[in-house]
């Protein structure tokens, strides 16, 4: 079975690239979707496409609307969602994406360091799995992709 996986969460490290490379090396039947990870491009896209704003609220609102269009469309296409919480920034978007995944019945895998366990306990409780590394996630993807041959005894 092939899985389409939405990669949500922090955009300040290369975790998506690491995960995709590890999955490719393991020859897993997965493809990945995700947000625009260029922070400035993500923030400014609404004003660039729909017109400049002098009020920062409306500048951000236009960008958020276009990013929500992308996120919701891709979440709908995904078979499962992986959300990574980093240690450096408060990640409201990551928490929101995790909530959307759960609300739309998408299986959720969460990645974060042990230091965030208490802060993320409710999100962790809603997840199917909580990992600390991309390697653990690749092992999970390998397990759920495993094919059994019941024709031989």
Question: What do these predicted ranges mean?
Answer:
Residues 1-153:
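Conserved catalytic or regulatory cores that recognize and/or transform ribose-phosphate-containing ligands
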